[in-house]
Amino acid sequence: EEKKKTLKRTFGMREAVTITVGTVVGVGLFTTGANVVGDLGPAVILATLVAMLISIYPSLLYAEMGAALPYAGGTYQYASLGIGKPFGMLAGWNFIISLVSVTSGEALAFSFYFKTFFSALGIELPVSDTVVATLIVLVFIVTNVRGIEMTGKLQNGFMFFFWGVAIIWFLMMLPNVNMPNFVQMPDFIAKSTPLSFIASVSMIWWCFAGFETCCAMGEEIKYPQINIPRALILAPFIVFAVNSAFQWFLVGIVPISEISSLATASAPFAEAMKTAGILGFPLVLLAAGIAFGGDFSTLNASIAVPPRYLFTMSRDGAMPKIFAKVHPKYQTPYVSIIVLGLLSAFLIASNSMIYIASLSLFADLFYYVIGITASLCLRKRHPELKRPFKAPGIMIGAPISIIIYLIMMTQLDKEAMITGIIWCALGLVIYAVCRSKYKNEAQEDLSGVIEEEIPSPEEKKKMDKEFKIWSIVVACAVVIVLVAYVIPFLIG
């Protein structure tokens, strides 16, 4: 029985990176992250840089916890052990609704770009956005129930397709980039305040939220003590490079006098191309890359990850035991996958990207505050824990990170706060009922989950080579993007 309730380790570092980045690169980048270009113009690079910087240290904290405790469930497990079960439940509960919201928002974004793709070809689809979005969620529910190997292979395929299309689109857009746009600041920038800049950083930070996604699948990652820290070291820099590159093209192709229109656009990239008069094949290519690459990669990952949290919480007695059921053939938490997928479909019915984004952002910030606090408490309560990776300066870095994230929470609208509080209250009620019902049951034996795996010398050498290649490529991407923003100032 225990064997059935332990998930299968099949992911390597590459899958850990692509699933993590795939969860992040999508709805935020193509909606709120691009909307901020309309608020800040070329100064958007500063907000994106700040968003990356405030993600790096928390990412290192998660690298430490993920390597030491490679469970399915991530922050839920870390907070349960470090702070206490109720905080673990709140962390897991908010992580779940955050990514369920991302799934819903991503499905709606897919629907728009899917229809834009056909519209650019002269074909108008007589189907509503909500119907298309719901259907694509159902497709990914099936692929995720079928097995984690399929999930990983699909994720790699989606990410590489996205980047293949993105590179071609970048090359096609280069002749349309107007360098003076980066030097001229829009008139409305003068009205910006420190609080409005913090609000912009918060919106762009949503593009980074989820940088620790691979921790939630720690029980399915091979050699997690090595692969989880490596994936988390790379993730914030990859997300920065991706967001900054796409923002650069938005700034470059849209006339500076009309760039403010992007702030309220539901699909900023399509709006930007239409404003710049760039139609035909480039628009078809953009829609294909976003819909079948960026959106698909995020949908695949955001449907795959939350069920691992619910699975672990159920296995631990914090949620109804039915969610701990593992498929006898595919060894996946199929009940959790199906239920959360249907919850995503329910949110899609709201057809409101603003509501979905606000709910997700509240949940993101709240569970990160809990997770960062857990890293501090784990150091104090469990000093004996074997830590293959250790974050430096935790006594300074963790409190500063908590303060920053709490400040960002003050920029959320009241509706998001109220919705998030109601969701937390509901979770606490379910938790109390389950703890009362299962209080006499023994905890699952997870000793096999946290047992360290040692790769052979040959395999370790191969893993080191892969990480080195990824590190070089990511470093080059970050440098290239930063140089791209500096060049317009150098050439006058």
What are the roles of these predicted feature ranges?
Residues E1, S80, A107-V131, V165, ...:
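Helix-loop-helix connectors at the membrane interface of multi-pass transporters/channels
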Residues E1-A34, G38-A43, S55-A63, Y71-A72, ...:
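Membrane-interface "cap" regions at the ends of multi-pass membrane proteins
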Residues F11-F30, I136-V139, F188-F246, L250, ...:
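Hydrophobic, membrane-embedded alpha-helices of multi-pass small-molecule transporters
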Residues N35-D39, A47, I56-V137, I141-V145, ...:
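Hydrophobic transmembrane alpha-helices that form the core helical bundles
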Residues Q77-Y78, G84, T116-L121, D187, ...:
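TM-loop-TM module centered on a large, flexible mid-protein loop between adjacent transmembrane helices
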Residues F114, S128-M179, K191-S192, L232-F237, ...:
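Membrane-interface loop-to-helix entry segments
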Residues F160-F188, Q247-V254, Y368, I372-L385, ...:
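Hydrophobic alpha-helical segments and their helix-loop junctions in multi-pass secondary transporters
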Residues I322-Q331, Y368-M417, V433-V473:
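C-terminal membrane-solvent junction of multi-pass transporters and transport-like membrane proteins
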